[in-house]
Amino acid sequence: MTVNKMPSEPPFGRHLIFASLTCLIDAVYKKRYHNQDVFILSILRMTRSKPVNRTTFCCLSLTAALILTACSSGGGGSGGGGVAADIGTGLADALTAPLDYKDKGLQSLMLDQSVRKNEKLKLSAQGAEKTYGNGDSLNTGKLKNDKVSRFDFIRQIEVDGQLITLESGEFQVYKQSHSALTALQTEQVQDSEDSGKMVAKRQFRIGDIAGEHTSFDKLPKGGSATYRGTAFGSDDAGGKLTYTIDFAAKQGHGKIEHLKSPELNVELAAAYIKPDEKRHAVISGSVLYNQDEKGSYSLGIFGGQAQEVAGSAEVETANGIQHIGLAAK
């Protein structure tokens, strides 16, 4: 009597582990992953190249589903450390939905430093895209608080009726209840010798810092407050900011900790709160590393009761000047 045997178990385990680790590594390093179809096709080929039993087929199907779920969320990959990323539908809504005054937190952010005059900034995420000019507003009401929201960006300029790409990469927005800041993680820039060609060049800079400014004249008259939040830079969102303000003395000081590079874990030297040209309360001071001055920092105070601070620091390191985004409440 002939017995029809079930197909034996193929060694699919390593494929499952490989595919899962690929998505996990992608999330850890915050890289966008646009080629998940390659893994899905590989899995389909595995099922066609040899017979598989029901258990194997179920496992491979589950792996494919996990890859699609994890990798399709790559546009808002984890901030790798302290700062989670916004991977919800809010990314697309920020580009397409009208302002809704029912949204929580800061509802809009005017783009001034992120895109200069005569330039265009194209943002895209989750199949949606929108082009902004200098002075246009980004709908931040749809973004999650205390998270880095990540968009793809292309910055362009029009010359003789032709749009020329200046740089491209990842556009980041960190939003709090009363303030927000933007950062640009550039991956490619225009070739200095060929305007129609792009070359790889990674650089990180802070764009706009804005929100509901605290008026210098309406600061608390006394007491002190300690703000705790995040410090993030290029490929490093795990930093912590601690900043204390003595309102009676109109003075503040703080520190940045837990960034990967020791040179970036610096003291924010004591500095006085001063009014800017619009009477907004701001603080500017020196950055210290091992008691040596290594740059500067600037913070704005935000909220009707000075609930938040947001700003940036520039730190001189062996690899040049590094920019750090700062936000705390």
Locations of regions flagged by a protein language model:
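N-terminal amphipathic/hydrophobic targeting modules at extreme N-termini
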Residues: 2-16, 25, 41, 45
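Low-complexity, intrinsically disordered or signal/transmembrane-proximal segments
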Residues: 15, 29, 33-36
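Bacterial N-terminal signal peptides that target proteins for export
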Residues: 48-59
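C-terminal motif of bacterial Sec signal peptides marking the signal peptidase cleavage site
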Residues: 68-70
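Mature soluble binding/inhibitory domains
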Residues: 72-329
